[in-house]
Amino acid sequence: ENCEVRRKVHIGKAITRGMGAGMNPELGQQSAEENREEIEAVLKDTDMIFLTAGMGGGTGTGATPVIADIARDMGILTVAVVTKPFSFEGSARMRIAEEGLSKLRDRVDTLLVIPNDRIFNIIDASTPVLKAFDKIDEILKNSVRGIADMITASGLVNVDFADITAVMKDAGTAVVGVGISKGKDRAAKAVDEAINSPLLDSSIDGARGVLFSVSG
């Protein structure tokens, strides 16, 4: 009921009975498998899919690789944008997240990982946890929107779906950065902010491809 998207698939009705997967990725996996046909129906005629999840729990960690498998089998460009738990959530949740990322990495074209701990590099350390989660949700949204806008937005130089596919197909682990600036040299400052974002899980050194978009 809290999800406002137009089409929803309620996975695992028989397995979890609406109770969640309780940090058990196997239950999350079984839940997605239970509704495989419904997921396939929703993904029909789709060219590109973004999978977003918080790794470390049962549903996101277990179900996301299954959905990725379905999408790849259907020839869909599959991009996962996921988070890793805060350190204070405990070593067990972090271990589950790492195991889930290992499975997911081989099942998507492009994997973007945002460590939750990095959020405190851009917000005050005293920020309440719920507010921190809100900020992380905003970053996930902006990451997906930034890629989608490259295809849909009009500009002097347009990027089409073929360009996106050329860079993101079988790309492996990737990073995303967003920079905003104003005034003199704003473009250069925004680029510097984007490539040096404290949220990046790794450097862009050695990257085989780059998608770069400027708007404003």
Language-model features and meaning:
Residues 1-216:
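Tubulin/FtsZ superfamily GTPase core signature
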